[in-house]
Amino acid sequence: MTKKFIGKEDFANLQKNKSGIYISNDYITVYKKVYCKNRLYNSRTSFDSEESVHDIFNPESIVELEIPPGAIIVKPVSNNYTKMNKMRTNKAIVNKITRLIDNKQIDDSYVCYSTYDPSFRYKVGSTVGTRLDTNVNKTNVSGIHFFKDQKEAENY
């Protein structure tokens, strides 16, 4: 399959049923759901309030990723998963991480990781990368999976 260059504006207008392999020629903002836990927590920590419980156990957060120029984006053929615009890439920059429960930004006291692979970590300011399966007929394969829209990532 031929790779096509895609910029921010073209990406925003990419149709849900338009599968393909694209090469980013601009910084493109996308979203991914992750799990986070406070690295300062240990099993002897006592809880004084509901707020402290949320500060330690907050499994669901949203990562705002920025796909850099030159990164590959795979838009799979439409199926149950891709009806939500689920795509994947080989490289992304972590811009910010926001807790779903209260919309607070995550700081360095948290470890955030992929919902599929807990060893794949996300930290604000870091660049993440992985091997990418470019087969557009497959959905749940290697790559950094993401959504165009934050609400779709939240509902995943």
From Swiss-Prot:
InterPro entries: DUF5758. It comes from the Viruses. Pfam families: DUF5758. Belongs to the mimivirus L223/L227/L812 family. This is Uncharacterized protein L223. It comes from Acanthamoeba polyphaga mimivirus.
